[in-house]
Amino acid sequence: MKINKIKIQNIKSNAWKFWALLLLLFSSIFSANAQDTIKVQNHIIDNQIQNQIFKYPVVYTNSNIKDFTFTEVSYEHQQNEFARKQVANEINTYQFLAQGYFTTKSRWKLFGDLAIKKILEKNLGWVLSDDRAIEQEVINPHYFYVPRKADWDNQVYALSGGFSKDITNHLSVAVKANYGTEKFSRTLDARSQITNRNLGGEMQIGYQITKNQKAFILGSYAENQKDFTFKYNNSNLNLEVYPETYLRFNAGYGRILNSFKSSGSGYLYQDIVDKIGLGYTIKGKNSIFTALYYAQNSNNIFYTSDLDLKVNERMKIKTKSNHAELFAFHKWNKKEIQSTLQFDQSDAKNFDKQSNGYNYTNSLNKISWTASLAQKSDSKIDYLVGLNLLYQQNEYDDVLSTTHIELNSLNTGIYTSKDFAFNKSKLNATASFNMYFPLPSKLDYYDTSGGTNIRFFDEVIIYDYAVNTTNYFEPELRLQYSYPTKNNKTVVFFTNLKEKIAVKKQTDYPVSINTNTTYWVQMGVQLNY
């Protein structure tokens, strides 16, 4: 049955009206008084304000933010039972994370992040790229695959940082840069090896309209390059008589091609991403309100060589995205409230130079809202309650396979947290409960390959559709014990436990999926100051 689709243009129109109403509502509580110091904790209680400080530093050039440094070493085990097909059965992650924010005597604000990860995946099939269907409903096309499952050994290094400063009484600037490198290696035929290099930068310029109002613009550019190679220790396994290991290429979502030889020593993916946007913020002594919008373009090119020459171009996929965001923060007495409302919309379309046409498109729409109310006594959390909502309306279409999917869903959640203080130390308990509701969705498929592509449809497309249209419950519990040491440093020992429990399958397709509980366990130590 075809669903009645919500008109996105109406959502956009209503969102802008809502922004104007919120701005009018909050304007009465903003004054030109000096703003109180913002103290950020390494805890879910400050996730929203922390995210704003690092994403849009130009907004906070004249804010008093207490210096902080967070470091973490942790281990995470993820056992995937109820999950999409292109996800490893087991994932073990060892990671080191660091984050810092400092203000110099001359009022330069410096900030940065560092992440080092070792990721071991067990039993991953149907994809030879570095993309995974953990957060994505559908992996972007243009990747090699074999059905056979194998283990992966992966390394991730990511570094980002920047600065911000008021240049004059009216002009402020913020500059961010990021660099990352990744290596993914599969341990069985077909043995793929992937090396990623990411480099990007962003500039934000603000103009102080009045003492408590600022307008700003932002622009960014990033270039991501991915080298892909594969080899067989037993070359006979790359023959059509061995379907488990015979190399295929997914040119859409169901349009499957036989693999093609490289004209060099491997293959290359190049992704160019640019972004431009604008925003407005108003601040009071105890309040912040920010509204912003940006548009982003991505052009991802697949080359049948390791050289990025025009003659080697084979596939392209272009994505146009729009993002709108509202953030509000207010505190009074010992209480504070934070709220983030976001709207994301994107359209993607691929192009095959050899056939001189396209076959794959997607249209993704998302509205998310997170809000929290907390009471603090110095660094002690008396209580925290919050909620989050995520509505998604996504459409995927491959005109040559032929596959058409409409996925609609609502994810709702609540969370709470509290500190239990002792003489010097404290114990924090945080619990969250999320529920995923699939809304009326649709899957149409007609096999135009004469049966050669039917296995991908049966084992990936239908299977994932059944997972995406199954209700699930996701509870999480986090415990952390904090103990202060010398020089205002705090050592934190923590553990997380999260489960994903399938509740009810909605699809009528005759497919059997694994509904055993998926779970995550994480433990680690932090040094915060």
Question: Which residues does each predicted region cover?
Answer:
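Outer-membrane beta-barrel "beta-signal"
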Residues: T37-I38, K211, N516-Y529
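Outer-envelope beta-barrel architecture signal
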Residues: I65-T71, S106-G112, N169-V173, K211-A215, ...
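Transmembrane beta-barrel strands of outer-membrane/channel proteins
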Residues: T71-H77, G112-K118, V175-T181, I217-E223, ...
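Outer-membrane beta-barrel translocator domains and adjoining extracellular loop/strand segments
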Residues: E81-A88, N123-S129, F184-S192, F228-N234, ...
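Outer-membrane beta-barrel transmembrane strands
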Residues: V87-Q95, A150-T168, A174, I194, ...
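Residues on the lipid-exposed face of transmembrane beta-strands in outer-membrane beta-barrel proteins
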Residues: A98-F102, L159-K165, G201-Y207, I276-G284, ...
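Long, internal scaffold/assembly segments composed of regular secondary structure
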Residues: F249-Y391
